[in-house]
Amino acid sequence: MASESKDSPSNNPGLHATPDEATKGYFLQQTMFRIKDPKVSLEFYSKVLGMSLLKRLDFPEMKFSLYFMGYEDTASAPSDPVERTAWTFSQKSTLELTHNWGTESDPNFTGYHNGNSEPRGFGHIGVTVDDVYKACERFESLGVEFVKKPLDGKMKGIAFIKDPDGYWIEIFDTKIIKDAAGSAS
């Protein structure tokens, strides 16, 4: 008799085998990063990673703006601002960039904690690309800062880059991730 998969509930205490029916339809919609300068961050996420701006929301009384980035085709987005907001919040896996006004020009603002130094917390987001090596060559030509290049370290074929605020982004392709996963126990 074959042993159960490591992914099975019996091998993962606390994991429910069947999600509660009340959660049917739930999905992960966004991850939020606080950013210092929207001009710099929007250029990075659109030019370097190829994301589109799905929706911008400004909150003048509270002095902040939200920029929702993603890989959706914005040609299908409604033109009505309220409908476009609803459309944006119906997309899967968006990145919400939160800009608190004034940080871009504040000489005393030192940036946000990215979670990868003490005290550790949040680690990174991940982006799938067609070919990790070609993508990283392009990133290098664009002057992107690397944490790890695909040939560095023990896990070959996986890279980590930094966005302008120091947040880590894992870069991988599905072929190489299959090979890397094959070495896991």
Curated annotation (Swiss-Prot):
Tissue: Ubiquitous.
Catalysis performed (reactions): (R)-S-lactoylglutathione = methylglyoxal + glutathione
Residue numbers binding substrate: 30, 34, 100, 120, 124, 154-155
Active site: 170
Cofactor(s) named in the record: Zn(2+)
GO biological process terms held by the UniProt record: response to salt stress; response to water deprivation
Expression induction or repression: By stress conditions such as salt stress, water deficit, or treatment with abscisic acid.
Co-factor binding details: Binds 1 zinc ion per subunit.
UniProt-listed Pfam families: Glyoxalase
Entry function: Catalyzes the conversion of hemimercaptal, formed from methylglyoxal and glutathione, to S-lactoylglutathione.
Protein family (similarity comment): Belongs to the glyoxalase I family.
Protein name: Lactoylglutathione lyase
Organism placement in taxonomy: Eukaryota, Viridiplantae, Streptophyta, Embryophyta, Tracheophyta
